[in-house]
Amino acid sequence: MFNKLVLILNCGSSSLKFSVVSSDNYTTKLSGIVEFLNLSQIRFFWKIKKKEYVRVINKSKSYDYALNYILTKILKEESKIFNNIACVGHRVVHGGVNLNKSVLITQEIIKLITDACSFAPLHNPINLLGIKASHAVLPHLKEKNVAVFDTSFHSSIPKFAYLYAIPYKFYKKFGIRKYGAHGISCQYSVCRSSELLQIELTSLNIIICHLGGGASVSVVKNGVCVDTSMGLTPLEGLIMGTRSGDIDPSVIFFMNKQLNLSISTINNILINKSGLLGLSGVSSDFRNLESEYNSNIRIKLAIDMFCYRLSKYISGYMSVVKGKLHGIVFTGGIGENSSLVRSIVISKLAFLNFKLNSDINMLMKSGKEGFINIKNTFPILVIPANEELIIAKESFSEIN
């Protein structure tokens, strides 16, 4: 007999994660991922109990196709699971000015998420596709769809940290300020760090490095976020797969006036053609870059720049907690799996008494969790991201 289940749709800019989680003990009944969307190949991978399934389509398919395949093929073929879905939880990257906590999705909420698309142009439109698809395939659950926002976690950031030094009216009238992202992942890292470090949540001071196709670093003081690297949009901060991260704003004006590039073209360059892809000239996928770190000068430069900027943010955030840090967390696809990135970054922080256990660091990947620091030095943790657990808990909380 199945307990009530929540279907979780985590629609990202380059992948689509899905899972079905039980309401009683949050065990996963089904999970999967769709990768390489909008390229020449689409790969479906899913797991039910201990059985694994893979389907590869050597043709570019739309996001709509992927969503419909998940909902009408993979899920419907598992009738015991499909028939016990009680609600649908959606990761939504940006809540905009008005949405800073999880909510049941209504037409009004859809409008507010749509209004926030300008803050997250890569993500919110895709998140809305997930909502639309679940409404179409699961119409009986239309009033039991829940939006869980990445920006909610960062709503505790103080005003002096989230404002930009531009005329104040732009904040008051248009909501131009720092909002952050990766908040759901950070929320899980905070909860899990508290358990692993055996420190009360309300006393916990940590720095969380969520490193994937998108990358950010956040500092948590007394259990709540007090600053983060991403800003008004997920473009600010660290170097990312295809995003530039921090640049001098005048670069935009220079490219517009001197190179005669339109604002929309520049926007596309900074979001889709920069970062690791732009620097390396090879790929935005870290898995394709890491193996050539020592043999390709441009790839080495890209990775070194990525690590340099991250180490600067970490050392700067140490001052926010006045040096009273309980640990650094690496999470996200790169954070969890790249021993190279962790090694380079931590080597730059040795003066702060951060030291890696090289042997353990090399082995820490593929879903493993734990400490990778040398004994009696600052704790360094690898915590696999589990946004789905947070979304499940928030979704059940909202419908109940």
Swiss-Prot record:
EC number: 2.7.2.1
Record-listed Mg(2+) binding positions: N10, E387
Required co-factors: Mg(2+); Mn(2+)
Active site feature: D150 (proton donor/acceptor)
Gene Ontology MF terms: acetate kinase activity; ATP binding; magnesium ion binding
Enzyme class: transferase
Stored InterPro entries: Ac/propionate_kinase, Aliphatic_acid_kin_short-chain, Aliphatic_acid_kinase_CS, ATPase_NBD
Pfam families documented for this protein: Acetate_kinase (PF00871)
Protein name: Acetate kinase
Summary of subunit composition and partner proteins: Homodimer.
Entry GO terms, CC: cytosol
Native organism: Buchnera aphidicola subsp. Baizongia pistaciae (strain Bp)
Role description: Catalyzes the formation of acetyl phosphate from acetate and ATP. Can also catalyze the reverse reaction.
Residues that hold ATP according to the record: K17, H210, L211, G212, G213, G214, D285, F286, R287, G333, I334, G335, E336, N337
Gene: ackA
